[in-house]
Amino acid sequence: MSSSVYESIIQTRASVWGSTASGKAVVDSYWIHELGTGSLLVQTQLYSDSRSKSSFGYTAKVGNLPCEEEEILSQHVYIPIFDDIDFSINIDDSVLALSVCSNTVNTNGVKHQGHLKVLSPDQLHSIGSTMNRSDIKDRFQLQEKDIIPNDRYIEAANKGSLSCVKEHTYKIETCYNQALGKVNVLSPNRNVHEWLYSFKPSFNQVESNNRTVNSLAVKSLLMSAENNIMPNSQAFVKASTDSHFKLSLWLRVPKVLKQVSIQKLFKVAGDETNKTFYLSIVCIPNHNSVETALNISVICKHQLPIRKCKAPFELSMMFSDLKEPYNIVHDPSYPQRIVHALLETHTSFAQVLCNNLQEDVIIYTLNNYELTPGKLDLGERTLNYSEDICKRKYFLSKTLECLPSNTQTMSYLDSIQIPSWKIDFARGEIKISPQPVSVAKSLLKLDLSGIKKKGSKISETHASGSK
């Protein structure tokens, strides 16, 4: 998806921030980077509330693999051990992604928290208690995007009624590597001989309220959008398989699942780097408290040094056998995504027309001018448009005719953030301008082929819908 779609999703989720009825519900996102290279080792998003609890641990100290019969797995593996949660693992040549979804979870309207960390095998010296962003980048080899989201995403969150200002300094905390998240009896404080450095943004807003957030909270919203994390997700993990690791998840699910214990030692067919994976799943139900402890461990160990050029491979593992479909928890950003896709398609057609005519084209107007039809023949396709008595060109969408002709509609369309739009509130019009001739020629063929693909997926025919 494009960055503009991510902006729309962030704005929509920010607009319902904190509206959940569960005051103890929270989404925690974690990013752990490697000291020395700054590369992202793992990113995790966990949901917890008064009954659902989620925590995880990550370490580069793997040790010996358990003794199990080794298997070679390829493409799609189906192991139906759960009938009331959705659990899957996907592995390719660079990452392992793990997802646990349950219909006891609804992250819509839940507040997010972000936690940025760097993993080190040894304790560092001469690290102050506060550092600015540039010093963090130099000392820990992090990039700007690792620390703080792009301005456009912060602006999108603020348009969604949050209040976020970019921070410049961070409080640095050091601790032994241990379990993270809602640590409880299911995830004991298991220290590993590694160090974690945490970076907490220093709050820089004079006045604050319950809509005031730091930039890592916005980064958490962005992580949900980029990874298409569903609202019923209790745990999502994406770990780089370019490094040795042991990943542990300790979840408490507030319903009774059947007792399960499964272990697998395997390699993936087509993996030239010869990685070995170990998977352990233990499910312990408690009928008295109507809850289940779900403990998952994944180990990735390399038998050969990882080469830069890797042949692609993919493995999908499904562990669910849902007897009935969930009562789906709908993401509130879905309508915004549909509108954005429709308007992007309409604008793409209009841009082709605009580039060929080499003049501005109005794609929306509040005014009810008398228009006469016109046609532009492009060989493979004919674009219908209209023009007024002043010879100004129009490429209007029937979809937008259902909206009231007032400034609220203009403000709504402005919030969708199509980059090429020029919005004139005074005239009540939205128009686009021609691209440079060299750019237009190079993109014409791509535009038309891309539009044809989009048009086949969207029921409305925008080209013939002009008046």
From Swiss-Prot:
It comes from the Viruses. Keywords: Host-virus interaction, Inhibition of host innate immune response by virus, Suppressor of RNA silencing, Viral immunoevasion. GO terms for biological process: symbiont-mediated suppression of host innate immune response. The keyword ATP-binding does not apply. It holds the Pfam family Tospov_NS-S_N. Coiled coil: none annotated. The keyword rRNA-binding does not apply. InterPro entries: NS-S_bunyaviral (IPR004915), NS-S_N_bunyaviral (IPR053928), NS-S_WIV_bunyaviral (IPR053929). Belongs to the tospovirus NS-S protein family. Multifunctional protein that plays two independent roles: viral suppressor of host RNAi (VSR) and viral inducer of host attractiveness to insect vectors (VIA). Acts as a suppressor of RNA-mediated gene silencing, also known as post-transcriptional gene silencing (PTGS), a mechanism of plant viral defense that limits the accumulation of viral RNAs. Also inhibits signal transduction by the phytohormone jasmonate, making the infected plant more attractive to aphids, which are the second host to play a role as a dissemination vector. Acts by binding to and inhibiting MYC2 transcription factor. Interacts with host MYC2. This is Non-structural protein NS-S.
